[in-house]
Design a protein with these regions (language model features):
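A short glycine/serine-rich beta->alpha loop
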Residues: 55-59, 91-96
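Catalytic cores of soluble, metal-dependent hydrolases
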Residues: 2-60, 64-82, 105, 115, ...
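Short, solvent-exposed loop/turn segments at secondary-structure boundaries
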Residues: 94-99, 187-189
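Long, hydrophobic, well-ordered secondary-structure blocks that form the structural core
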Residues: 82-94, 106
């Protein structure tokens, strides 16, 4: 399947100038989509994804829309590993009751609902946050599929070993929230981690050299509705980091894949 790289712009946070090879979708008219995803919004998002599937590099606005990653993985019809590089686990219980999809529970819903998921790899969260997943109830929920690589382990150089333990015959889908990065490299509307861009790119390089990659999505923009000075500063930082990630992935992702 041909790779199609897309921008899903809900908050008008992406520059209108076109980056080569990127298809821009104005999603500002999709109601019921911020933080929580209504059934109607989900169907409209699916309609944007369906023509070319999930293969490629996709920018999905702020972390308020990270649930799009769940919708993306619903299109995968083969065994796969989900790699989440994020400051948070996104494994909350539904706060509004029922089973409504949200930016805070989408990973949990992938675990519960996707029969093709083989492994879930959480990368970049603080150890104290991951420790909360170790209760008996959480262990039962994950059904032995969970692999955790804390930020502390990343700093100690242990990530490469853990990543290489994944089944090499199973392709991966990578989801990145830029809130995992230090504010030098990204400014988001969520609390952030301390990862450097160099560390993130090294993780991506390890994943792509070891495994076939189905697709990649990236969120972590800063909504324009916030204060103008802060927004303009965030815009400069985020555009720079998005451009760097896009060019890094364009240059390396499919190049490495073609040599396997």
């Amino acid at each position: 399947m041909k790779n199609r790289n897309m921008i899903f712009d809900f908050t008008q946070c992406y520059p209108k100038r076109k980056e080569p090879g990127l298809e821009w979708h104005d999603c500002s008219a999709i109601g019921g989509s911020r933080l929580y995803c209504s059934r109607d919004a989900e169907e409209k998002i699916k309609a944007l994804i369906a023509p070319a599937g999930v293969s490629g590099i996709h920018f999905i606005d702020s972390g308020d829309y990270h649930y799009i990653s769940k919708i993306m993985t619903d299109f995968i019809k083969e065994p796969f590993t989900l790699v989440l590089i994020d400051h948070h686990t996104d494994m909350q219980d539904a706060s509004l009751g029922g089973d409504i999809l949200s930016c805070g529970n989408w990973v949990k819903k992938v675990l519960q609902e996707n029969p093709y998921l083989q492994k879930l790899v959480l990368i970049g969260q603080e150890k104290k946050m991951l420790d909360k997943l170790q209760s008996g109830a959480r262990q039962q929920e994950t059904d032995g599929k969970l692999v955790e690589i804390s930020y502390e382990e990343l700093k100690n150089g242990k990530a490469h070993e853990k990543i290489k333990e994944l089944p090499d015959e199973v392709p991966v889908y990578i989801s990145i929230d830029k809130d995992v990065l230090d504010e030098k490299y990204a400014v988001t509307n969520w609390d952030q981690g301390k990862m450097s861009m160099g560390m993130l790119e090294q993780i991506l390089k390890t994943l792509v050299t070891e495994y076939d990659v189905i697709g990649v999505d990236i969120c972590g923009m800063y909504p324009e509705e916030n204060s103008l000075p802060e927004y303009l500063r965030a815009e400069r930082v985020n555009i720079r980091s998005d451009e760097e990630l896009y060019r890094f992935l364009q240059k390396n992702l499919f190049c490495w894949a073609s040599h396997k």
